[in-house]
Amino acid sequence: SDIAMVLDECVPYPAGPNHARDSMERTVRWARRSIESRRREDQALFAIVQGGTYKELRRECADELVSLPFEGFAVGGLGVGEGEDLLHEVAEFTSGLLPEDRPRYLMGVGRPEDIEFAVQQGYDLFDCVLPTRNARTGSLFTSKGKLSIKRAEFSRDPRPVDESCECYCCRYFSRAYLRHLYVTGEILASTLQTHHNLYFYHRVMGRLRQGIRENRVIYSSANSEQVKESRSY
């Protein structure tokens, strides 16, 4: 692979300060050992900042890791149940501890509104199971909010999942057909719905990249809130 991640220990939420400190210190020791045992020069090595929701531990961990010759830095241990406000607070704080000339990777965080926030804090990389996991359970992202394809109201709906989407799924298949595939247990349902959700995320990231080039955020918070809060669609 082009990038290798060091071993780390991610504590659950909530975790006491002693548990979080032990985990953070173990993560730093593993990071140092990764540098000492490194053999490949053609592979970037990323460290992972841990420390739970404790800012003093995050700062201590970041200071230790930044002093080592890593090509990039990840922030782990978020998106584990701490809630949106605390996630944003710790993500913003930790990003400010990392160098601007190397990639910042926010691990395991993948809601569109969280990605938008994180990009504004300087994060470059993300990973999350959300688009594929939601697709398998019939939950689809659209420009008007989340759509649950399993709902009976879509059984005769000839429209695509999202009329503003140009993905293969939306160009060739109706909501009614997708619902039929889903309720009958056809594997094609997961395939098409995964394609759609990944295409949605591709569009989100494309708009964010365009916004960075133009020094503005195109994927607006209002639309993010719509995606997050919509329950009846």
Model-derived features with residue positions:
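Residue-level recognition of short, well-ordered coil/turn positions
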Residues: 1, 39, 123, 186, ...
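Non-catalytic, usually N-terminal nucleic-acid engagement modules in DNA/RNA processing proteins
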Residues: 1-39, 152-155
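C-terminal extensions of enzymes
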Residues: 8-14, 162-233
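Glycine- and acidic
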Residues: 12-17, 21, 72-78, 187-190
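Generic structural signal for well-ordered, non-membrane alpha-helical segments
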Residues: 20-27, 58, 87, 171, ...
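Glycine-rich phosphate/ribose-binding loops and adjacent secondary-structure elements
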Residues: 25-28, 37-161
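Predominant activation on well-ordered alpha-helical scaffold segments within soluble catalytic domains
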Residues: 28, 32, 88, 95, ...
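Generic secondary-structure signature for well-ordered alpha-helical cores
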Residues: 32, 36-39, 96-99, 183, ...
